[in-house]
Amino acid sequence: MEKLVYFDYAATAPVRPEAVRALTDALERFGNPSSRYEYGRQAALRVKEDRETVARAVGCAPGELFFTSCGTEGDNWAIRRGAELNPRKGKHIITTAVEHAAVLETCKDLERRGYEVTYLKPDRTGRITVEQLTAALRPDTVLVSMMLVNNETGVVLPVEPCARAVKAADPAVLFHCDAVQGFLKLPGPLARLGADLVTISGHKIGAPKGIGALYVKKGVRLRPLLTGGGQEEGLRSGTEATAQIAALAAAVRAVQGDAGRLERTAAVKEYTLSKLREAVPRLEVISEGDAPHICAVTLPGYKSEVVVRVLGDRGVCVSSGSACHRGR
């Protein structure tokens, strides 16, 4: 079989060897963290240590970080429960038209349940401004949801100044950030963004699929989305996925230990764009100076699905949109 060249890390990243080793080791340590005997205590201690690792990377306290199955679960939890947190205030939500489907489809479902949602439209470069957001605020606004990095274009949205502006205008408005594409891909901890709720996912940084986390800022009384045995301090029921959690923590340590990764990624993007411009003079670049790990271009006169198919036939893996929608 022809060797494949993989260019779609925004869809998922290969599982890091460190994560594989941690996963395998944890699978052999099979105890349930809720059990009170030795196997359970060992598992609980491992989860505690892994939570501390991920929390440090996010920039929050371990008690503010709750493990989930994926970014979609985190987004659903944050938006559905965040929107209902202050029912007397109102039922108005603000988000952007370029969010991940986990946010957009959840907002559409809430619209069917009586909420009103304002979708901020980006300019032709994919950007949203602070002024757009503050102009959309209303007395009945209860929640704002804005992604950090767009998974298709690589545009970095102004989450930090937007969160600051929202809190200055109305501290009662909750601010959620889907940071799945930004976690450990941009400098600085996510907690500095000033959001009340932040979603992350493991498989974008080399952990296996099936593990993510939601940062819930201290003082935000979010109700659980999943009820049952009361795991995760009663906020996310279900036996903890100890092996996936261990792999996530291992991936976090591996990424953080990779000195110069951001500069190296930016250099690869710059090199790729320079070669593409040489080959295709009419190439149009989207978000050239934004996220270093996403390179989005358009080829005037060519249909994207044709380009994807032709490159795929030659062993080059690229996408024409979000792989979070089936078949793209």
Task: Report each predicted region and the residues it spans.
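Pyridoxal 5′-phosphate
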Residues: 1-328
